[in-house]
């Protein structure tokens, strides 16, 4: 019971800390006169992936590499299967042109790059981490050069400058909350795995990854209910790209990762590749450039089968 309470407390701190850090980071960026296009693509995207980054980096550093990997793989599965699936049950989404030419191809390329690095030698080292981070910067430069309208749409609504002391407060408290939340979450997850005699991978792929995906789920559902334009398939795909290239890349640079539980390579990573590929035919059939409740049910079913097969 205490371990579960630790995990829940950690998740709450991660979510709250992530929001505080985002507010402070965006406000500071505007104070420094950084162009909105750069803020939208770099600051916002990076900070919204901060919970996954902190959890994975601390897990690897503490000697729990499977928890670090399963958090990212599971989070990517949850973004497309759970978050997008639930969102589509609430309303319909029109797919933007950038999905075909940028979002989906880059997500698949990042997924295959990650797969090729870790599948062959069951190890993600600093060299691979540097390559992944450099690939992310190349992607960002491409977006800034050719996809400016799409990036501007991703900017947060709060752009009014805060008093400077509030900015510092949000930045400091957000960073502390993220660190503390990750500590509690990792401690609770490892203890829970030991208590029920299950692998760290199982806890990471299910509870931890879903927990770190809660901000995306909350934002997507609220935006859909309010009929706002802020939510798109591109938002979730962008989150997956950052998870793979930024979270895994930076984590590997800080602490190289060795796969201990082979089911990550024999099972989980193939499901991640599969659901990433599945998005493309779902967009085209039965109604082109549109996703509705039927596609949402398919994605939720795929995610449910993934979880069932994971615990077998």
Give the role of each language-model region.
Residues 1-312:
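Hydrophobic alpha-helical segments, chiefly the membrane-spanning helices
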């Amino acid at each position: 019971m205490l371990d579960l309470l630790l995990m829940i407390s950690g998740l709450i701190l991660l979510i709250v800390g992530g929001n505080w850090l985002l507010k402070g980071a965006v406000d500071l960026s505007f104070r420094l006169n950084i162009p909105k296009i750069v803020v939208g693509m770099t600051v916002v995207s990076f900070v919204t992936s901060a919970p996954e980054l902190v959890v994975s980096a601390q897990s690897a550093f503490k000697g729990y590499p499977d928890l670090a990997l399963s958090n990212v793989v599971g989070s990517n599965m949850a973004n497309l299967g759970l978050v997008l699936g639930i969102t589509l049950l609430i309303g319909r989404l029109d797919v933007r042109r950038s999905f075909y030419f940028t979002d989906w191809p880059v997500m698949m390329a990042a997924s295959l790059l990650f797969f090729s690095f870790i599948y062959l030698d069951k190890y993600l080292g600093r060299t691979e981490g540097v390559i992944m981070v450099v690939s992310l910067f190349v992607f960002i430069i491409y977006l800034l050069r050719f996809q400016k309208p799409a990036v501007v749409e991703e900017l947060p609504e709060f752009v009014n400058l805060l008093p400077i002391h509030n900015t510092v407060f949000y930045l400091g408290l957000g960073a502390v909350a993220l660190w503390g939340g990750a500590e509690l979450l990792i401690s609770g997850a490892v203890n829970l795995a030991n208590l029920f005699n299950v692998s760290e991978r199982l806890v990471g792929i299910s509870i931890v990854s879903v927990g770190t995906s809660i901000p995306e789920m909350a934002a997507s559902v609220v935006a859909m209910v309010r009929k706002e334009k802020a939510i798109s398939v591109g938002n979730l795909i962008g989150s997956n790209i950052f998870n793979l290239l930024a979270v895994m890349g930076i984590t590997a640079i800080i602490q190289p990762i060795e796969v201990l539980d082979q089911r990550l390579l024999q099972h989980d990573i193939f499901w991640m590749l599969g659901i990433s590929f599945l998005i493309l035919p779902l967009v085209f059939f039965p109604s082109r450039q549109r996703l509705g409740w039927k596609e949402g049910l398919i994605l939720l079913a795929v995610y449910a089968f993934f979880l069932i097969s994971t615990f077998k």
